Amino acid sequence: MEAKLKTFFAEFGLSIEKEKIQLFERYYRLLISENEKYNLTAVTGEDEVIVKHFLDSTAVLIYRDLTDLNAVDIGTGAGFPGIPLKIMVPGLKLLLLDSLKKRCLFLERVVRELNLTNVTVINERAENLGRQKPFRELFDVTFSRAVAEVRVLLEFHAPLLRLGGETILFKGPGVDEELKKAEKAAKQLGMELKDVYYYRLPGNFGERSLVVYKKLQNTPENYPRRPGIPEKRPL
């Protein structure tokens, strides 16, 4: 796996040191060994996991530096993009948020076995966490690879993001229609579309995009709405 990691990361324009390679190898072994128990991912082949999960998660680093930032990964699942970003940027302070207890148990094991510091795992819905004072408007940057519309994701992210912070959403190449639908939500939540970065994964694994919003105003106190409402009645 070491040679593949080096090759794929180099093709993506990122260098990777031996210690980080070893962490990715351990993460892969945990992901595969615990997959059946926790139902973590449908992607299990070595090349696919390296490119579609590990490498894709680190696409943010082509766009910006994350050193010493306070970040939350919303709907992290098996730890993407949060854990690959933490491996690549040890100085990142990270909260991994997921609503499923079994996934959080897996994440706690990964954090423990990889000896990752300044990483917290919380089993909670974003709609609830966004209403808790210790977390509201706390984070410098928020991420999500979760499968949901942009306008829905913005309601999860904006309440947790500090003024001037950035929300980075991982999307496919055809995101224009979603962005148009999200214009009203962004305005109501104090967010503004900053940029969309398109990129291609190596090994013919397809095109992706990073959608970046900046927070310009405080999010009104009535957001986020109750759990389930953002998906049922998007802004």
From Swiss-Prot:
Disulfide topology: none
Molecular function GO terms recorded: rRNA (guanine-N7-)-methyltransferase activity
Main location: cytoplasm
Residues given in the record as S-adenosyl-L-methionine binding sites: G75, F80, A126, E127, R145
Keywords from the UniProt entry: Cytoplasm, Methyltransferase, rRNA processing, S-adenosyl-L-methionine, Transferase
GO CC terms, sorted: cytosol
One Pfam family per UniProt: GidB
Protein EC: 2.1.1.-
Compartments where located: Cytoplasm
InterPro entries xrefs: rRNA_ssu_MeTfrase_G, SAM-dependent_MTases_sf
Signal peptide: none
Physiological role: Specifically methylates the N7 position of a guanine in 16S rRNA.
UniProt similarity note: Belongs to the methyltransferase superfamily. RNA methyltransferase RsmG family.
Listed name of the protein: Ribosomal RNA small subunit methyltransferase G
Underlying gene: rsmG
